[in-house]
């Protein structure tokens, strides 16, 4: 699918979609509980992968209007009858690899081409240290993965610099083992807010996990716990809302986005980023509304350590801002659905913007965006960010636009509803 974007601005009021990060975790924890109701979940390709995987591990999940009714396995996942195919969802792969380790049988997990190239070695090594037999069939740390259950609590270490999903996966599984676990993080924990989201959901389900954060971060996880999520309402998604807010800031127009209450989401940093760049923005935390009323943007330096999903959005903001925007501490952004640093550099270059790329850094020199045929890299965040660029440049066509179904299936409808000129076509 392709999308053609014309020069346009935005106006009006819109609701932010539900959080993908919270939805993944709520479904997983509910599937490990008994009876739960999840209100206003995000239903997208990625979260449907988690639903399907949880069902294969023994949970019963029914969609009833804007809620999910979940009868879980009470901490004892079954052995699936077939291979778990997670599609394009790295979150599902990492979470279900650890959850499958709680069972007694053998589980095989795989995914699409992108998933089969993403690293999982540190997670597999820790699971082996905790009494599980877990292997990458090709010996490269990537899917397909084979897990034979028997997860036991113990003392373990894991590298925190590649993906916080490894840590979240272990935090979801380890409280359900018979023995306690001590998990030490080596190096900087990248994308830490996503671990905070995991801890937030686990706390709401009654789990107890203790943190020691002196010289090195350490999680103390008592064993033999039970999850009881009961009822949970998924908050709005700041990652997805970043495109709506950035669109108004870039085009010097006005918008109000609802359903953005405070939570543990690190991507709420988009509000401070836009403010630092010169946008007129106001967040009413009590009402859960964010209003943007244009502004003259200038370049900034952004540390992407905690907020990798904002990198494509900020790269496009930098393309229209005065001066240079420098995105630092961003090597882990290369290990997403695609190498997002490289992808944004390549596509912005096509649109007339000067960029320079280093191992953990992307520099964007603000300039005049020009319409072009650009590649979406089969990556939802690349497609959505380039849509914003097209609204400034006009006459821009983006391929692999179907990638939006991963996290924001209604993205183009949402953008049209607030004034964006977007036209979809089959390739």
From Swiss-Prot:
Catalytic activity: 3-phosphoshikimate + phosphoenolpyruvate = 5-O-(1-carboxyvinyl)-3-phosphoshikimate + phosphate
Matches recorded under InterPro entries: Enolpyruvate_Tfrase_dom, Enolpyruvate_Tfrase_sf, EPSP_synthase, EPSP_synthase_CS, RNA3'P_cycl/enolpyr_Trfase_a/b
One of the record's GO cellular component terms: cytoplasm
GO terms assigned for molecular function: 3-phosphoshikimate 1-carboxyvinyltransferase activity
Location in or out of the cell: Cytoplasm
Coiled-coil ranges from the UniProt annotation: none
Record's function text: Catalyzes the transfer of the enolpyruvyl moiety of phosphoenolpyruvate (PEP) to the 5-hydroxyl of shikimate-3-phosphate (S3P) to produce enolpyruvyl shikimate-3-phosphate and inorganic phosphate.
Protein name, as recorded: 3-phosphoshikimate 1-carboxyvinyltransferase
BP GO terms, sorted: amino acid biosynthetic process; aromatic amino acid family biosynthetic process; chorismate biosynthetic process
Pfam families per record: EPSP_synthase (PF00275)
Subunit structure: Monomer.
Residues the entry annotates as binding phosphoenolpyruvate: 20, 90, 118, 165, 340, 381
Keyword Transferase set for record: yes
Listed PANTHER family: AROM/DEHYDROQUINATE SYNTHASE, PENTAFUNCTIONAL AROM POLYPEPTIDE
Keywords: Amino-acid biosynthesis, Aromatic amino acid biosynthesis, Cytoplasm, Transferase
Residues at which 3-phosphoshikimate binds: 20-21, 25, 163-165, 191, 309, 336
Pathway the protein takes part in: Metabolic intermediate biosynthesis; chorismate biosynthesis
Keyword NAD: no
Family the UniProt entry places it in: Belongs to the EPSP synthase family.
Active-site residue numbers: 309 (proton acceptor)
EC number: 2.5.1.19
Gene3D superfamilies: Enolpyruvate transferase domain (3.65.10.10)
